[in-house]
Amino acid sequence: MNKIRKTFQYGKHEVTFETGEMARQATGAVVVRMGDTVLLVSVVAKKEAEEGRDFFPLTVNYQEKTYAAGKIPGGYFKREGRPTEKETLTSRLIDRPLRPLFPKGFTNEVQVIATVLSVDSKVPTDIPAILGASAAIGLSGIPFNGSLGAARVGYRGGEYLLNPSLDELKDSALDLVVAGTRDAVLMVESEAQELPESVMLGAVLHGHQAMQVAIQAIAEFIQEAGGAKWEWEPPTVNTALEKWVVEKSEAPLKKAYQIQEKTARQAQIQAIRDQLLADRAAEREGEENAVNEHELAVIFHELERRIVREQILTGQPRIDGRDTKTVRPITVKVGVLPRSHGSALFTRGETQALVVTTLGTERDAQSIDDLDGDRQEEFIFHYNFPPFCVGEVGFMSGPKRREIGHGRLAKRAVVPVVPTLDKFPYVIRVVSEILESNGSSSMASVCGSSLALMDAGVPTKAPVAGIAMGLIKENDKYAVLSDILGDEDHLGDMDFKVAGTSNGVTALQMDIKIEGITKEIMEQALDQAKEGRLHILSIMNKVLDKPRSQVSDLAPQYVTMKINPEKIRDVIGKGGVVIREITEATNCAIDISDDGTIKIAAHTTEEGEAAKRRIEELTAEVELGKVYEGTVVKITDFGAFVQILPNTQGLVHISQIAQERVENVRDYLEEGQVIRVKVIEIDRQGRVRLSMKQID
């Protein structure tokens, strides 16, 4: 295979695609370079599909190699381990726009692997990874309705930034990734600083327009490489069986989809499906391969899809009886757990999230070591989706890709309103436990987390709410749905999640399964989402509309003080012995900054004040004329040495012990005795002279 190379200018960066030199046994492979960021993206597809498979087994793996940043992995084995959260999220980011471009009925197993070989700190890896995946699939000849482009968009000073660097993103009010084809936007993932809907939509359109140069370059690159296309035909529909299924099941299915309660509806649909199989087996008894369950299931699913969609497009009530704009009934409770620092129970229809906020010290921050460098994460968000929340039995293990993705979306939504560590000295962990799910559990997590944070006394800028929107579109007819159910998400054409405050959008996520989504449709979806979001906020605000005035008594209590930086060594002690003794005695965590700022985190105010007193004693300067209570540590013929501060001793001369003449010091003092003394002199060498007789 000849080496093929294609270079084009993409914003401020030059992008290069190469094929024919690396990974030549893969079905398709591309080395993509953007700045000094280099990735190898490979795709391998099985030639034959597994018989009876009714889904498309696409796997996307994004992996970062530490050598890409000139680093050696930590740990005992010194090699990369299981995927990090960033790797999982980037894998999902690549997967989401690719999946809808594979043709319906294509069920061959496909694996895309994007490996980071070199990383440029100015160029995030996700955009070249998506571009490389698009090019590699195009080269492979697999059935694919591409090419796919991607762009990152920032917003600063009223202007959009194309593919901003990591440094530019720090000053940007927006971090938005958009992917799509020449004619359609397919995926959006974003975080924003309470921006108007018009700015968000403008960013999506700006990114889609800007990515056209990348889409064109990928198409030219694939054409130049000239790979052979797969000979693949979509499975034919058994029209006779289709007609039979419709006759048998359409009427009962329509009736079933009028059952508003999810579990009862699913049970009825399963009963119809089981009866259909039994009827088919009875009619074809004695025939070889009498019942093709896979074929029957595909037709039955298409019938379900048509019934639900027609019902909505003809203006009939939705599955649960609502119109297109109505949000399900909402109930809100806060402070539901007695020993947590903050908690909320948010229920919207048959979706319920129990969200808990825990406040910790700086030592509780999450340490992250990846290709971007070492850093501390002070705001942690975890989302859990146990099997019981959908009435299923399932294997309990670590978080799955979906849970990590939903948790990150909810985190994006609330991060813009959460104070930084310098304004609120706590590390914050939020956990969302999904207890019931029938659509939009990530947005329930957003609402619940906002309430739980305020219940914990975290001074958030404003309450945040989220809503999931859907779309049903057939030709020129369409309906935008507010607060979608799980079935509407599954059977619809778009999943469009918007979160924000009353002032603007903080997070936007969009996944579109079809082409033909116009600017007008997206505008309507955003406007309708705003209406729903404000409605949800109004209900939340009736229960809790601002943060508690103080944090929970159960949370760590912070005491902050400042000392002379030269005294830090006195507080720490040799080998840390002094500070360790203070923390053990007072049950506190103590953090000392180089500028002398000390933060004491205690379980109670009393423990914090005790630690503060100990440090004040250690770092106090002796004051001339001040009376101290000290302990006699040594007696000599000429006087006694008295410990007046932890690191300071002074001499009480024999002439300063009493008003009368003292012949023997031991007649008046003994070692270990506690006495009151006055500082009468501090000489140039810092030596302290004390007096007992000059005390009034």
Curated annotation (Swiss-Prot):
Gene Ontology biological-process entries: mRNA catabolic process; RNA catabolic process; RNA processing
Domain of life: Bacteria
GO cellular component, one term: cytosol
InterPro entries listed in its UniProt record: ExoRNase_PH_dom1, ExoRNase_PH_dom2, ExoRNase_PH_dom2_sf, KH_dom, KH_dom_type_1, KH_dom_type_1_sf, NA-bd_OB-fold, PNPase
Location in the cell: Cytoplasm
Function, in words: Involved in mRNA degradation. Catalyzes the phosphorolysis of single-stranded polyribonucleotides processively in the 3'- to 5'-direction.
Name of this protein: Polyribonucleotide nucleotidyltransferase
Protein encoded by which gene: pnp
Family: Belongs to the polyribonucleotide nucleotidyltransferase family.
Binding site for Mg(2+): 489, 495
Gene3D superfamilies: GHMP Kinase, N-terminal domain, K Homology domain, type 1, Nucleic acid-binding proteins
Database matches in PANTHER family: POLYRIBONUCLEOTIDE NUCLEOTIDYLTRANSFERASE, POLYRIBONUCLEOTIDE NUCLEOTIDYLTRANSFERASE 1, MITOCHONDRIAL
Ranges of residues in domain KH: 556-615
Pfam family, one: KH_1
HAMAP family (UniProt xref): PNPase
Catalytic reaction list: RNA(n+1) + phosphate = RNA(n) + a ribonucleoside 5'-diphosphate
Domain S1 motif residues, every copy: 625-693
UniProt-listed Enzyme Commission number(s): 2.7.7.8
Oligomer status and interactors: Component of the RNA degradosome, which is a multiprotein complex involved in RNA processing and mRNA degradation.
GO molecular function, one term: magnesium ion binding
The UniProt record lists the keyword GTP-binding: no
CC cofactor: Mg(2+)
Protease recorded as keyword: no
Keywords: Cytoplasm, Magnesium, Metal-binding, Nucleotidyltransferase, RNA-binding, Transferase
Top-level EC class as recorded in UniProt: transferase
